[in-house]
Regions:
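Acidic-basic catalytic patches of nuclease active cores, encompassing PD-(D/E)XK
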Residues: 1-34
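A short beta-turn/loop motif at secondary-structure boundaries
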Residues: 35-39, 94
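Catalytic cores of nucleic-acid endonucleases
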Residues: 2, 60-110
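Conserved catalytic cores of phosphodiester-cleaving nucleases, focusing on short active-site segments
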Residues: 43-66, 79
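Short, surface-exposed charged micro-motifs
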Residues: 35, 44-46, 104
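Short, low-complexity, polybasic intrinsically disordered segments
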Residues: 107-125
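A generic beta-sheet turn/junction motif
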Residues: 38-40, 49-51, 108-109
Length: 125
């Protein structure tokens, strides 16, 4: 039973990330990576939008009230470290950027997306 729940959560997370990527692409963003892993951590989606390098954390919850609080300080720190590592190791892709930001995308059980741009400052990491 637990394995089924874990697989269901995994597939649900993939669907939320796919929905998020499509939403950004509709806005004209270029997806650079999905589920990027490096020694510092994992980043759900990395994209380029209007010259800005965007690191996106996607969260899905049944209860929308829990969504905004579902990204912990520890997760933000790891995301910041992973983003720094990405920029250092992908300077050929990131050399012409005008800046970077961290977005949080909250996906409710109803499938609605809420994109929170600049959910966290890069300086806070």
């Amino acid at each position: 039973m637990r394995a089924r729940r874990g697989r269901g959560a995994y597939l649900s997370g993939l669907a939320a990330e796919e929905q998020t990527a499509r939403a950004y692409q509709k806005r004209g963003a270029e997806i650079l990576a999905r589920r990027h892993r490096n020694e510092a951590g994992e980043i759900d989606i990395i994209l380029l939008e209007d010259g800005i390098l965007v690191f996106v954390e996607v969260k899905q919850r049944k209860n929308r009230a829990e969504l905004a609080e579902s990204i912990t300080e520890r997760q933000w720190r790891r995301l910041g470290l992973a983003a720094t590592h990405y920029m250092m190791t992908h300077s050929d892709e990131t050399g012409a950027i005008r800046g970077c930001r961290f977005d949080a995308v909250l996906v409710g059980a109803d499938g609605r997306l809420e994109i929170i741009e600049n959910a966290r400052s890069f300086d806070e990491h």
